[in-house]
Each structure stands twice: as C-alpha cells, then as structure tokens.
From Swiss-Prot:
Catalytic reaction list: N-(5-phospho-beta-D-ribosyl)anthranilate + diphosphate = 5-phospho-alpha-D-ribose 1-diphosphate + anthranilate
Keyword Magnesium among UniProt keywords: yes
NCBIfam families for the chain: trpD
Lineage: Bacteria, Pseudomonadati, Pseudomonadota, Gammaproteobacteria, Enterobacterales
Name of the molecule in the record: Anthranilate phosphoribosyltransferase
Organism, as annotated: Yersinia pestis
EC number(s) recorded for this UniProt protein: 2.4.2.18
Keyword Metal-binding: yes
PANTHER family the UniProt entry points to: ANTHRANILATE PHOSPHORIBOSYLTRANSFERASE
Any one GO molecular function term: anthranilate phosphoribosyltransferase activity
Record's subunit section: Homodimer.
Length: 333
C-alpha cells in the first residue's frame, strides 16, 4: 500500500484525504524509513499540498493524539504556525489570556519556538505555568479560568518520528502547518495565523474539511497574526462557506504601528514585556496588536463589531484582569 502511495507522490499526483490519512498514520507509528519520509515530504512540498491532503494528515495525528475531555460549551484556539521570521512578542499567547478575560474560553495548542526566540511554551514556562499539566487539570483550568494550554509533545508523541528528518531538511514542510490543526481538544472555533499569504485560503478550506464551525485564517504583512502595521488577509469559514477579505488596523478603530514596535526577545524578556502588558502597563503598540487579534477571535463567537471588540479587549488589558489569569494558571502547578 505504501509503495503505491510513494509512486503516486513521485509522479506529482495528489493523494485523496483517505490516502493521506493512511500515510500519516504510518508516519506517526514510525513505520517509514527516514529516506522515505524525506522523499514524501519534499515531493508534497514541491507540488504543493492540497487541502484534502492536509486534512488527512491532521486526522491521522488527531486519531493518534492523547485523549482530552472535550467540553460541550463553545471554545476556541488562537494559534499561529510560527516560522514567520519576525521574532515578534507572543501575541497569540497574550491574546488567549485577554480573550478569557472578555468571557470566552480558549484552549491554546502550542509548542516551543519555531522562528522567534520564544514560542508560546517557552513563554508559559517563564511565567511558571506547568507545561505537563494532565488533560484533566487542563480541562478544569478551561472550565474555571477560561484558558488552558495544551503542550503539543505531550499529546502528539508520534511527532517524534518525523523530528530528525525535519531537522535535517531545514525547510518548511507539511508539518509546519499541521500544528494549529491538531489541537487535541478539537475546538469548534479557531483563529489561525499562517506564515505565508498563499496558505490563507488552503488552510481555511482544510478547516472546512475538518468540520470546524467557524474559523478565520490570517496573514498580516509578513506575520502569522492580525497585523497593526499592514493590511491582514483573512479567509473566514462560517458554517461551511468561506469568505475572503482584507482588514486594516482602522477596521478595528486602532492606530497603525511599525512592525519594529512588536520586536520580542528571549523568553524572560518576553515574559517581562507581556507581564507589563497584561497588567495594563505595557506599550500601546503591544496592546493594539493583542486587541486586534482578540477582536477577530470574539467575532468568531458571534460578536460581529470589530471596533467594539477591540475596545473591550483594550479595557481588559488596561484593567490588569488578564494578568490575574496568568497567575491563577501558574498557581495550579
């Protein structure tokens, strides 16, 4: 079976969703030789992965994931692929705490850094938040605090089989876009940032195949976030239909700031930057960046007015309430 799929890929043909699921199920079980895995990933990359192939791979990884007790209530993920090369502060991580303060639930799936000096997990560890919280403890945090973090390596042990090949290839592959699609809590809503504008629509189409209820995929001026220095490309999935549009900082009622204003640092520096921000004492550019991302996330919950949402987020940031959730989550260690 595998040989048939290899030959198909080497003829630059696309796999069906089912074929991709079979192939990636074998990959996470460690059944491919490193040379076979490298050949598969590169042949898919050169041709361009289809939404059906990405969805099949995501389904294989979700089927292999450790169990998380999925809640009945609405909850979301806010996550980027990373790898945008901008080394910005952890906007999506800060946004998760602010969104929870605004009254919505966020189960954030994260990992250590891809391109910035500090990924979401690096930052959380710097705040004293345990990365190895059990699924049950994380679910309780989601219930009580409105926010929890699910550390990818804890739930996706099969990823390790691909790691040596990925490190040797030193190029982006399908695995770089899979992270945001394989949240073990299986959220019905998601705001997903991607490192390239070419990925915005294909990833939205993938989310449709995966059965998300409502989601937005974004790329803003080189960043895997909603941008405040440039227009943001959006593909929004809403009950099976996808709408593509552009957003500017002005659509949120926010000022523009240069990308340099969002420069991040090492985990400890980022921790200090975000601690000040979430206590209401941060830079105005940082607050605006988080407010824009929270505003779009709130839209997925049916709060359609982006200006109102951004204002609500800014009020939460200035009140310092978001930081209370950071300390409360750290206290659960």
């Amino acid at each position: 079976m595998m040989q048939h799929l290899f030959e198909k890929l080497f003829r630059a043909e696309s796999m069906s969703q089912e074929e991709s699921q079979q192939l990636f199920a074998a990959i996470v079980r460690g059944e491919l030789e490193p040379s076979q895995l490298a050949a598969v990933l590169i042949s898919m990359k050169v041709r361009g992965e289809t939404p059906a192939e990405i969805a099949g791979a995501a389904q294989a990884l979700l089927a292999d994931a450790q169990h998380f007790p999925r809640p009945d209530y609405l909850f979301a993920d806010i996550v980027g692929t990373g790898g945008d090369g901008t080394n910005s502060i952890n906007i999506s991580t800060a946004s998760a705490f602010v969104a929870a303060s605004c009254g919505v639930k966020v189960a954030k799936h994260g990992n250590r850094s891809v391109s910035s000096r500090s990924g979401s997990s690096d930052l959380l560890a710097a705040f004293g938040i345990r990365l190895d919280m059990s699924a049950e403890q994380s679910r309780l945090a989601l219930d009580d605090l409105g926010v929890c973090f699910l550390f990818a390596p804890q739930y996706h042990t099969g990823f390790r089989h691909a790691m040596p090949v990925r490190q040797q290839l030193k190029t982006r592959t399908l695995f770089n876009v899979l992270g945001p699609l394989i949240n073990p809590a299986r959220p019905p809503l998601a705001l997903i940032g991607v490192y390239s504008p070419e990925l915005v629509l294909p990833i939205a189409q993938t989310l449709k195949v995966l059965g998300y209820q409502r989601a937005a995929v974004v790329h803003g001026g080189g960043m895997d976030e909603v941008a405040i220095h440039a227009p943001t490309q959006v593909a929004e999935l809403n009950n099976g239909s996808i709408e593509s549009y552009q957003l500017t900082p002005e659509d949120f009622g926010l000022n523009r700031y240069p990308l340099a204003a969002l420069q991040g640092g090492m985990p400890e520096e980022n921790r200090d930057i975000l601690a000040r921000l979430l206590q209401g004492k941060g830079e105005t550019a940082h607050a605006a960046a988080v407010a824009a991302n929270v505003a779009l996330l709130l839209k997925l919950y049916g709060q359609e007015n982006l200006r109102h949402n951004a204002q609500q987020a800014l009020e939460m940031i200035h009140s310092g309430q978001a930081f209370d959730r950071v300390t409360a989550l750290a206290a659960r260690g």
